């Protein structure tokens, strides 16, 4: 009852602006990926990233290299991204098997959408849906299985794209439209794929290289536009990319072919997230939100650091025209001067539930606008991956892994040379509370913080920044220690050091967020 009264009091005190908003259904496939070319970054790193913004598994493991003495076959699965553990089978089904050549696979980090291997090949992902008529469930591959095979077998982005294209042609693609942001230590590519339609087990895809001095963004909408397939250094596509569009009536063969328009079927090639991020990195371009499409990439007006990508993935548009709390203001009286000011209510937060937003808008239409934020509370995990051509693979590639809301959680460094993760990483936290699952180590404090975000925000932000600074500050030291151990004791000992560092860093973040949770419980001891 107190909670309901609090909401009503907040609503009554709000200073509203006009303009009713209808809230759309939450896209269950929502994700965001930012790419940075090596000449656009502050230190020459190639960067890719991913926010996995839905009810996907939170368990993560590092899969070791597998030695195949002879040619054989390996199984391909569906829905492994919903399993409760590495050995679990909940909702998972066997789709078939494919040829596996003799030889060794590469070690890789097995997130719901596998993200990095030991050779500094890395991937981000966003579901771009596309036309329903293109989906053929008889195709063998879901996108995450393509990623897994590519990370096990490939060391460069181009090779990964070629291999996935070959697998799609031979075995078929059975998923909705997907985008992968595929990076290695030299370059990053924007790859989009769709099914070939109900009558064909195959697929259609295109890939565009992000210029070295540019950045790109994918956020659940097809983005690839025109294709210059004569420029083999910067464009790749399936052989049927034009044929399928004409056959299915998506392109008349006369107007300029735009991949996003043919296969996506939408009216625009971007959303608020692409617009906000690109506009923030290249404001002088004057990008227009009401345009039909934006450039796939832009040249940033300053060098972009790994830390800035982390910050962009934490965006809630605070202070901008897209700020969803901008109308939720209350009058505050200064106790000393008696002056009255209006401020954002401490009870307002960017992640208000649908019920809360609907209540506020029922009391006064237009109280809360609806924009899809970059950082959302339903995020399972997120990645920012930096790759360096001037460093050995073991320490050149770093996955900065976060769980739960990217705007509220710390990031844990996992190096290419890290060979295992603490036990708490292996337990999914999506099917109930489990104190042993790493996501719940952060989720408790994060969710409590939103009860009165105005009072807790600074504490969360300070903790996030502390570990961001710690990771950046210690990165050079860790690499130096690795090199010293490598020279004195060999690679196995050096990798053990990296593995221990990841575990220690994770432990420090867990303790900090457990302390925050206790602090917030004390803060709200008398009620919310």
Segments and roles (model prediction):
Residues 246-390, 394-395:
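Glycine-rich, aromatic-lined ligand/substrate-binding cores of catalytic
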Residues 133-137, 145-154:
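Second-shell loop/turn segments in exported
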Residues 6-15:
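Bacterial N-terminal signal peptides
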Residues 468-528:
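Histidine-centered catalytic/metal-binding microenvironments
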Residues 346-484:
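Substrate-recognition/cap regions that form aromatic- and gly/pro-loop-enriched pockets
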Residues 1-4:
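Positively charged n-region of N-terminal signal peptides that target proteins for export
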Residues 22-142, 163-309:
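A contiguous strand-loop segment
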